[in-house]
Amino acid sequence: MNREHVLTQDNALTGGNARTRDNAQTGDHARTGDNAQTGKYVLTIENLQSYFFTAKGTVPAVDDVTIEVPAGKIIGLVGESGGGKSMTAMSVMGLLRHPGKVVGGRITLDGRDITYLNPRERARIRGNEISMIFQEPMTSLNPVYPVGRQVQEAILLHQKVSRAEAKQQVIEIFKEVGIPEPEKRYNSYPHQLSGGLRQRVMIGMAMVCKPKVMIADEPTTALDVTIEAQILRLMKRLRDEQGTSIILITHNMGVVAEVCDYVYVMYAGMVMEQAEVFDLFENTSHPYTQGLLKSIPKLDSREERLYTIEGVVPNLLRLPEGCNFCNRCGKAEARCLKEKPGLYGIGADGNGMSHKVRCFLYEGMGMEDAGAVESGGPDAQATSSDGEVAEDGR
């Protein structure tokens, strides 16, 4: 299934407009933000390991994850629950709590190592240089304070301005994110706003200090498709006009096809495939990614049953000895059950983004060789499965 097919189906629901390869690589609109500098990684995550040390054992929620975020681009993190997407984001934000801990790797923000900052140093950059939008705005906003005051608090924490100046900034950011009657909404409580408006408040809070990077953890999951389309357009506008880099965590491959520039597919705490968005859809390589795309319902299909990848994400306390996906993969061989594959490069786009796949099928191959590997979804018969739900490393 190529990207255009996914977009056609997604746009039928959201009313979005498909991008072409050219404007996905050059930007849908001219980028005017200071951060929109070609070829610069504003955030790098190198070999990150975040483990949870529980009474039952060690849970490798994030294991050897490397992600590069160019300035002014949207990076998609996709995969099933339990894949490590949210835990990667929480590690970057310094929000892991006991018994979770970053045990290895390096996180660099604009050239500065932020992996092990103390609480005071972390507070200086969180919400200021890097911010996060959480999945459910109703639980992220304090119900007993007006939403305007909550956004104002972030400004007063990071900027030397008066309360009156901070209030004016809040009203301006409410206008930018499309909140009607911003002066009135400043004094509204969360329960007085719709889900879409609450999410716009959260986006405004994340953007008010003009951070270099914004992490959006499934920001449209609780919204209807009309509001989802509005939020996605807003995120693209922030990227295009302000040069903001965005990490978008989602299950929705249609959303990925619509807004993302680069994609990382995660499974059981590891990156299984990474590529420029067009390359991922046109040259889908890892059996897991193929299965995800094959699972998308087709509008013109007469099939009575939807395709699924059999089995569940493995229990992170009892991962397979070999490839994390081997128990669900129809292409698994004896080697896959005993050895863990590395990330093998099979090509690169014009901007230097490598297409990499964590699968022995592509070991030592280039893009031309990779094209010869059989495509399509995996034979959805699992070699084995203990049937247990994974530890929550989503």
Model-derived regions: residue spans:
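A short, flexible loop at the N-terminus of ABC-type nucleotide-binding domains that lies
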Residues: 38-42, 51-64, 95-101, 118-121, ...
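The feature captures the beta-strand-to-loop junction immediately N-terminal to the Walker
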Residues: 78-79
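P-loop NTP-binding/switch modules centered on Walker-like glycine-rich loops
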Residues: 94, 215-219, 223-305
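Conserved ABC transporter NBD signature motif
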Residues: 102-113
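Conserved ABC ATPase "signature" region
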Residues: 113, 165-184, 293
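Short catalytic/signature loops enriched in Gly
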Residues: 180-183, 274-382
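A short, proline-enriched helix->beta-strand linker immediately N-terminal to the Walker B motif
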Residues: 208-212
